[in-house]
Amino acid sequence: MRERNAAGIGMTSQRTRDRLVDALAAQGIQDERVLSAMREVPRHLFVDEALESRAYENTPLPIGEGQTISQPWVVARMTELLLEPGVPERVLEVGTGSGYQAAVLARLVPRVYSIERIGSLLRRARERLQAVRLFNCQLRHGDGYEGWPEYAPYDGIIVTAAPDALPEALLEQLADGGRLVAPIGGAGYQELLVVDRRGDAYEQRRVAGVSFVPMLEGRV
């Protein structure tokens, strides 16, 4: 991957990034830790060069293989919800995609474990995370429905594609006292769900309507 300018210029400059973060705050994102992480992570490095000029628009963008980098507001809100009970020590992300959500998490928590089913996306995400010198992310080519049992339990789990229902394996890998944030539902419209584990009980609440790509089984 050709070396790119993390600082950015013009439509990828720090000033443009700051304007996006200010807009996120105006739209209800309150956690200063999350806003700071979004300010620090160069989103333009996590999209193709042809889309760099749109990187700081508050919109999802295609990343290839029928996948997208999530809308910044959604990344911020899901991260904010994950951190609400306290900073988790270990977070599992299901759906690495571009690597951007993992990069934001890596600014905020000690360890990030991220699974991606599409090998070509995983390779590019690994290169991008190395380029921005975030080394506390461990990536795996695998089926998100199976989770990553070797490093379970996780204090936080964040799912960046939408299953029809919560995968049982992910609930089992959530630590007691941990929190899971995921979009649930069919193609086109889902609800963002927050799940808190209390022993063998799982408390759920719906937060907002969202639209994510579907979560698929297997790996390619």
Curated annotation (Swiss-Prot):
Give the matching Gene3D superfamilies. Answer: Vaccinia Virus protein VP39
The catalytic residues are 70
This protein is called what? Answer: Protein-L-isoaspartate O-methyltransferase
Species the sequence originates in: Halorhodospira halophila (strain DSM 244 / SL1) (Ectothiorhodospira halophila (strain DSM 244 / SL1))
Family under the similarity heading: Belongs to the methyltransferase superfamily. L-isoaspartyl/D-aspartyl protein methyltransferase family.
The main location is: cytoplasm
Q: Which GO terms fall under biological process for this protein?
A: methylation; protein modification process; protein repair
Q: What does this protein do?
A: Catalyzes the methyl esterification of L-isoaspartyl residues in peptides and proteins that result from spontaneous decomposition of normal L-aspartyl and L-asparaginyl residues. It plays a role in the repair and/or degradation of damaged proteins.
Query: Can you say where in the cell this protein is located?
Result: Cytoplasm
